[in-house]
Amino acid sequence: MENRYAIILAAGKGTRMKSKLYKVLHPVAGKPMVEHILDQVEQTEPTEIVTIVGHGAEMIKSHLGERSQYALQAEQLGTGHAVMQAQELLGGKQGTTLVITGDTPLLTAETLKNLFDYHQGKNASATILTAHAEDPTGYGRIIRDHVGIVERIVEQKDASEEEARVQEINTGTFCFDNESLFEALAKTDTNNTQGEYYLTDIIEILKKEGKAVAAYQMADFDEAMGVNDRVALSTANKIMHRRLNEMHMRNGVTFIDPDTTYIDEGVVIGSDTVIEAGVTIKGKTVIGEDCLIGAHSEIVDSHIGNQVVVKQSVIEESVVHEGADVGPYAHLRPKADVGANVHIGNFVEVKNATIDEGTKVGHLTYVGDATLGKDINVGCGVVFVNYDGKNKHQTIVGDHAFIGSATNIVAPVTIGDHAVTAAGSTITEDVPSEDLAIARARQVNKEGYAKKLPYMKD
């Protein structure tokens, strides 16, 4: 196979996004658009990849790292000018060069591979990736002669009435013979209404030189969509989420309502797991087999074991082991580690805490900066008081302990195995194993006192 190269155009400012964030870094299904492109390009196995950067160059480099080389387009003078910036890295090399924009996140590796193969099969100097558009408004039209050979690309504003009816459009992605590409770029000029170097002018230059120009029409028009504003970004997200949901369903995951379920690129879900409506799963989350993720739950960068049930809860940067159940309305904050068969009930918050196998934290409880052993019962309304106003402190609770309802545990404290805290206690000292700790005032009943209270009178 001959050498393959790729140039990703990512220097545009993206003013129509009206955003402080660089356009190609806007996420689609949780991943920056330009990273989607790079992922797909890498699957075509190019020898070298060059990303053209301009505004926000350092942000792009920090995202893509050493996966790409970079060339700076300091002044934006058109797509042709952008490709010129790669000449120092790719000029004079033999092979085929893919030119692709960084704002087309829906393009797939399969389409790009087909484009490469078609280009090489036609022995063309240039091949345009095209698509059939039901409404081609705004796109450049592919004009072919009577036998179907590509003649030129006509932009919308320059198209005649007949040309405007053409439904085959230019997607902005091309394959070029690398040497022909840079030779033709040297012959482009800025004699147009925008005063820019157009990459599309190369097609006419190559045709005039008698070189072969081909066009490969891809099957799915959705892949052609460029993202230039928030409306297009929303559409791209919808399409990408649909693709991802369909992939998971084909892999054995049940979605109760795919249209309201939002799964990021890169999330892993095991077979026979059920995802209910309104669920959002983000980042590098891994979910095991035979789980139930209840309606309106949100899971971010977490690892969920097999046979876990999550009901209407938020889980962030946490681990939930096999057979545990969480919720409804629980919140696992970063560094929560919930053991096998643990029960985390309604309105429980866990942060930077390890809860071992079989422990039950039923309701209305805060567990922060703590290590809980096995088979503990934590009653209603328990607070692990971990913050003294300056520093966080740790609490350790041993196996088989019983923490009575409304206990305040003021860290740092260690509660031993099989120890018990009485309901309503404020624990400020260690509790030895098998001891009962009572830390509350003795009850006093004042006879007849209630009658003296003004709100108790008739």
UniProtKB/Swiss-Prot annotation:
CDD domains in the record: GT2_GlmU_N_bac (cd02540), LbH_GlmU_C (cd03353)
Location within or outside the cell: Cytoplasm
Top enzyme class: transferase
Entry's Gene Ontology cellular component terms: cytoplasm; membrane
Positions contributing to UDP-N-acetyl-alpha-D-glucosamine binding: 9-12, 23, 73, 78-79, 140, 155, 170, 228, 333, 351, 366, 377
Positions bound to Mg(2+): 103, 228
Function as written in the Swiss-Prot or TrEMBL entry: Catalyzes the last two sequential reactions in the de novo biosynthetic pathway for UDP-N-acetylglucosamine (UDP-GlcNAc). The C-terminal domain catalyzes the transfer of acetyl group from acetyl coenzyme A to glucosamine-1-phosphate (GlcN-1-P) to produce N-acetylglucosamine-1-phosphate (GlcNAc-1-P), which is converted into UDP-GlcNAc by the transfer of uridine 5-monophosphate (from uridine 5-triphosphate), a reaction catalyzed by the N-terminal domain.
Name of this protein: Bifunctional protein GlmU
Source species: Enterococcus faecalis (strain ATCC 700802 / V583)
